[in-house]
Every structure is written in C-alpha cells, then in structure tokens.
UniProtKB/Swiss-Prot annotation:
It comes from Alteromonas mediterranea (strain DSM 17117 / CIP 110805 / LMG 28347 / Deep ecotype). Na(+) is not transported, but it plays an essential structural role and its presence is essential for fluoride channel function. This is Fluoride-specific ion channel FluC. The chain crosses the membrane at residues 1-21, 39-59, 72-92, 105-125. GO terms for molecular function: fluoride channel activity; metal ion binding. One of its GO terms (biological process) is cellular detoxification of fluoride. InterPro entries: FluC (IPR003691).
Length: 127
C-alpha cells in the first residue's frame, strides 16, 4: 500500500472522480424523475453502499488489505460519491416545507435501501 503523499494522491484522485460521478448521476436522475423527491441523492447513496460493501468483500476474500484500492476506491471515490450531508439537508428542506411524508420517506428509503444494498453485496460475496 502506498504511504505518505502517494496515499493521499490515491485518495484525492478517487475523490475527484467520485465527486464528478456524483454530480453526473444526481443531475441525470433528477432530470429523469424531477426534483419533487431527492432521488438523485438516494441513487448515489444506495449504489455507493452496495459498491463499498462489495469492495470490502473482495478485499477480505482475496486478502487485499494492503492494496491501494481500499484508499483509492473505498475512501476516495466512494467517499466522495455518496453523500450523507446532502441527504440531511434535503430531508431538512422537506421538513421546513412541511412535506412530512416525503421527509419520512426520504429517511426510510435512504437508510433502508442502503442497508439492503450493503447486505446484498455481502451475500453476493459469500457466493
């Protein structure tokens, strides 16, 4: 595994890629489904949860704990791709607009779907 500056460069490269992917996915999903519900954020969080659980399964299965992929993909790319802060602000905005059902649905969909996606990835890795 890279150390020092090289490790931070791996994380930064993954983070830049993940941020650009998040922007692309959220704007694409929002343009398809509209902005009445934050489906773009839900999409990146669910896909990211699945991908991170899958990555950790691959790392464990193939004993890649010293691999730079954990930093590049897990911390950098998927860390920037998923977004808990945006989920929080979007939920608060729904609450401020007194859209109680949409706010509750956003919380339950994000938490439930992300947990389900992670579980599915883990089960796939058990194979």
């Amino acid at each position: 595994m890279p150390q020092g500056l090289a490790l931070y460069c791996f994380i930064a490269a993954g983070g830049a890629t993940g941020a650009c992917l998040r922007y692309f996915v959220t704007t694409s999903v929002d343009s398809l489904f509209g902005k009445h519900m934050p489906f773009g954020t839900l999409t990146v969080n669910v896909v990211g949860s699945f991908a991170l659980a899958l990555l950790y399964g691959v790392i464990e299965r193939y004993d890649l704990s010293d691999s730079p992929y954990r930093a590049l993909i897990g911390v950098g790319l998927l860390g920037a791709f998923t977004t808990f802060s945006t989920f929080s602000v979007e939920t608060l905005t729904l609450l401020e607009n007194e859209l109680w059902l949409k706010a509750a649905a956003n919380v339950f969909l994000n938490v439930g779907a992300c947990l389900l996606a992670g579980w599915l990835a883990i089960e796939l890795m058990k194979g």
